[in-house]
Amino acid sequence: MAKVPDMFEDLKNCYSENEEDSSSIDHLSLNQKSFYHVSYGPLHEGCMDQSVSLSISETSKTSKLTFKESMVVVATNGKVLKKRRLSLSQSITDDDLEAIANDSEEEIIKPRSAPFSFLSNVKYNFMRIIKYEFILNDALNQSIIRANDQYLTAAALHNLDEAVKFDMGAYKSSKDDAKITVILRISKTQLYVTAQDEDQPVLLKEMPEIPKTITGSETNLLFFWETHGTKNYFTSVAHPNLFIATKQDYWVCLAGGPPSITDFQILENQA
């Protein structure tokens, strides 16, 4: 009699083979590091201020962060903006994070120069006129003269009576800036030197009187006055990287440096 094939036997063999394959796969996975597994070696003494590990878990509205060494806040370009020491395995909440962000005692890297939006909040109060009727000569011994009703230029003069004479008024900053802030007025007039953009001629702006308080967009009337020996520099408050300058065959303007001439000699009592 022919033997009838045992279907259950085939199924058992198939199951047995799959079980062996499964065991092999399990064994392989146990001996293989997880893609998400991260391990850290012993920390060197010179690296103690660096962030070592960070584990995050959220429950409800509270974020629990566990730090082994410290937490740092970095900008997108990788520069460290804030650094805060925490105890080992310390858990902090959202309130703690808010306190860290607003803590004025944290180490914060400040920019070298403040944006104009911050400068616009500074108030400058007039103090007094500190110089009367002086002449400005550039490094080529050219004197500043009137080009027309609006603009100034520089020219070599035989008769200094043709040169523009200026008065200089001092202002005090509300942020207690150590720099000397001044306004330049053409003597015996109400015309004030007013800055524009780089390589644009400075304007002569007529006002009814010298401004008692200057803020915001009006800071284009003000300049930081610096002296180095006999050289005088006038940096625009509205554009802190630009100076009053003379330029060949051009009006007096704002410039960052050569080929424009940014240093001047002050000739006083030339009335």
Curated annotation (Swiss-Prot):
An annotated Gene Ontology molecular function: interleukin-1 receptor binding
GO cellular component annotations of the record: cytosol; extracellular region; extracellular space; nucleus
Residues found modified as Phosphoserine: S87
Alphabetized SMART domains for the sequence: IL1
Keyword tags: Acetylation, Cytokine, Cytoplasm, Glycoprotein, Inflammatory response, Lipoprotein, Mitogen, Myristate, Nucleus, Phosphoprotein, Pyrogen, Secreted
Keyword Secreted: yes
Propeptide part(s) removed at maturation, as residue ranges: 1-112
Positions bearing carbohydrate: N102, N141
N6-acetyllysine: residues bearing it: K82
Ranges annotated as spanning the membrane: none
Modification(s) after translation: Acetylated within its nuclear localization sequence, which impacts subcellular localization.
Keyword Membrane: no
Localisation per UniProt entry: Nucleus; Cytoplasm; Secreted
Lipidation (N6-myristoyl lysine): K82, K83
GO biological process: apoptotic process; cellular response to heat; cellular response to lipopolysaccharide; connective tissue replacement involved in inflammatory response wound healing; cytokine-mediated signaling pathway; ectopic germ cell programmed cell death; extrinsic apoptotic signaling pathway in absence of ligand; fever generation
Chain spans, region Nuclear localization signal (NLS): 82-86
Highest taxon, organism lineage: Eukaryota
Function: Cytokine constitutively present intracellularly in nearly all resting non-hematopoietic cells that plays an important role in inflammation and bridges the innate and adaptive immune systems. After binding to its receptor IL1R1 together with its accessory protein IL1RAP, forms the high affinity interleukin-1 receptor complex. Signaling involves the recruitment of adapter molecules such as MYD88, IRAK1 or IRAK4. In turn, mediates the activation of NF-kappa-B and the three MAPK pathways p38, p42/p44 and JNK pathways.
Free-text note on domains in this protein's UniProt record: The similarity among the IL-1 precursors suggests that the amino ends of these proteins serve some as yet undefined function.
Recorded family membership: Belongs to the IL-1 family.
Subunit structure: Monomer. Interacts with TMED10; the interaction mediates the translocation from the cytoplasm into the ERGIC (endoplasmic reticulum-Golgi intermediate compartment) and thereby secretion. Interacts with IL1R1. Interacts with S100A13; this interaction is the first step in the export of IL1A, followed by direct translocation of this complex across the plasma membrane.
Protein's recorded name: Interleukin-1 alpha
Species name: Homo sapiens (Human)
Encoding gene (name): IL1A
